[in-house]
Structures are given as structure tokens and as C-alpha cells.
Amino acid sequence: MNRTYLQKYLKTNSSIQWLYMKYMQYYAKKFLNHPETWKQWQLAKLTAMLSYAQRHCTYYRKYIVGEVRMDNSMEIIKSLPLLDKNIIRHQEKNVYSDEITDNWKVWLNTGGSTGEPLHFPALYKGLPVEGVCQMMLYMKMGYQWGDIIVSFDGCRIKDEDRSRNIYWQMGNANFPFGKKNFSTLYLDNNSVKYYWEELKRTKPAFIRGYPSGIMEMCKLAMNTGIVNLTSESFTQDEKNFISSYFKCPVYGQYGHTESSIFAIQNPADEVYYCSPIYGYTEVVDQKGQHVNIGEQGEVVVTGFVEYGLPFIRYKTGDLAIYGGETELGETILTKLLGREVDCIYNKGGKKIYLVGFIFGGHIRAFNYIQTWQLHQYEVGKVEMYIVKAREYSDNVEKEIVNLFVCNGFELIIHYVDFIEKTNRGKQRFLIQELK
């Protein structure tokens, strides 16, 4: 299946859009009405992926020996080495499927937020589980036929449009990523009113997208439906802030360009439930062993979507607290802690993760900051770049300084008018130069 061609027709052909939506709804309802089938589906897809990798990937052929069956696939997956970006770069074609030709046209790129972008071939087979899982989430959120979806992402808007105060573009299709895409790249005090005016004209039932962009828009609106947060780490406090502003529930979604995990988070808490329909999720320690319930580890995934480069026991670089497994086969992530690299080092050399330190600290001061970014170039010293919100004051600054000083840091604050986003329109909260 070539997703590029599907996206093309979804954008230009209303009949294809209608058929695709009906197809996704059919399977979404089927899975939602029969959750007892999820674990068996997962086992069948895991068996199929391992068998495919054995037949088509030189790299896996040396590790997967003998027939792969449903009664031994779990044993096989646990015996395989972990896969990371360095292995993929060094092995390249050995890890790729032998169905990938020299002139293969469909390639994907990860965002490279860790400084390690990945370029890999895209090949899809069978049921489009990405669309099915997206539809299951929308139906859980109350989606009705005809509801309008919009997104906040990093799309690039033409200079001509921006000169006319247009900071959005039409999407490929309403489902799943929105009929209208608002760019987070151009949000500021001058442009925010045009975003809000267009939102009011569009009247979406669902807003999905980067938490930092949606948060920034709310804060800017304060200065001068249903929300689904995707693609960035965020906290319960941020969900509550957005929920109170829009007066609607806020759901979380966790996934990657590598199409190997699809997890959802309900409005009331921070727990993620990883879909067994989409992939097989583990949480492992530094030795690659699965952690116990309540312990911290790295999220490792095996996806059922991507065959061009089978992501089998792939290290995501994300840390989480393992919460066990539901009776339906969903892996529980009690708390997503962010990326392994999202940490700073105090004067004693202690590694401190941002999620627990800042996001989990319920610091009131951050309600009075439009956006911010940390830079660390030496142990124990942090520079913080801040775009002030209107209510920012000396007391807010004191609270921030006190937080860092009490935890063993020297803090230098720079006040700026703008903080550059990534190419994809995401907000990087940390530039870490220490290795």
C-alpha cells in the first residue's frame, strides 16, 4: 500500500474520502465491539511481522532461526536484540526489506528532536491500522459523521498567504489530521487574533496537535469542541489549562513517525494505554530486561504498520513508568517521563529529568510565561530564555530562580521576544550541550 497515493486521493477525491472513512469506521466499530479479540490480533500480527522480517531482512535472518508460529512468537521477540538508530544507520539495506528497490520513492523522516533524525523507506501491507486506531480514538471522543477536525502543526505557509494574515492551509482530508492545518510557526501577539477568527469561522468539533502550540495560542489570546494533544510531551496541568480555556475534555495521544506505537490518554489522568492492535510495547532497563510494575525504563516498540524497515524491539529513547497490562492486552504507561536526553545536571552532577523537575512541580510561575527554553553548556549552570506573558512580574522571576537554586543550579535568565521552533513547528524546551 502506498500511503502517498492514498493521501493524494484523500485530498482530491470526495468519493475516496467517503469510502476510506466508512472503511475505517467499520473496523473501528468491530474492534471496539469485540475488545476480547485484541490480544489474539496482536499475537497474529507479531507472528506475521517476525516471519516477514525473517524472510525479507538480512539483519533479522541471523537472529530469527526456525519457523515462526503463534505459539512461539512471544518467546522469539524476547530473545531478539534491541534496535536503535545507530544500528539502522550502520546496517541500512540489511535492515530494510528486500522489497525496497534502489529507486524506491516513498521515504519518511523522523523529526530529529534528539539531534538524530532517521530516514527510512515506507512500505505498508494489509489493514491500515493507523487509520483504524485514529478512528477508534475519535469515536471514543464522541466523533459524529460530519464533525470538523482541525490541527495545529508545523506546516509551512506561503509568504503570499502570510502577507494577507493567513497562517493555515487546507489539509489532505478532514480525517484523521484535519481539514484545516494551522501552523504553530507564526504564532505571536500580532497574528493570534487571525488564528482565533479563522477557528471561529471553521467551527471545529475537534482540535488536535502540538500541546505547546495550543497552549501558546491560549496564552496569547488571554494577553490580547474537544482537544486532542499529540506529538509532544505534556502534563496534566497543561491539559487542565487547555481544557478550562476551551471548556472541553482534552485527550492525549502518543506515537512516532516510525509507526510502532499508538497510545491514548484519558482527560482525567496521565496514564497512557498502548494499543495492542497497533504494536507490541515493552518497558526495559539499561540491560534490555523488562522492568517490574512501578519501575522506570525505556519504551521499546515493535510495530505492525511499517514493513519497509521492520521496527522490531526498537528503542524510542522515551522513558516511562511501567504500569502492567490490561486484560485486553494494552501496555500501561503510568507516566511518560519524556526523552532520555531531556535532563539537566546540577552542581553535584546529578541528572534531573525536566518532566519531574519542572512539569511535575506544579510551579505557578509557568502560568505567566508565554514560552520558554533552557540551554545547558556546563554542569550546574542553566540559561533560561523567556517570552513573558502579560502578568509576568518580579515575583514570578523569584519563584523560578528559587526553583533552580534550591536544586543546585546557577540560573541565568534572558528575556526575548521570540523562541525559534523546530522545522516541524514543535517547541524544544531544552538545548542540552552536555554529553
Task: List the predicted regions and their residue ranges.
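AMP-binding/adenylate-forming
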Residues: 128, 150-212
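Conserved AMP-binding/adenylate-forming
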Residues: 225, 234, 238-325, 340-341
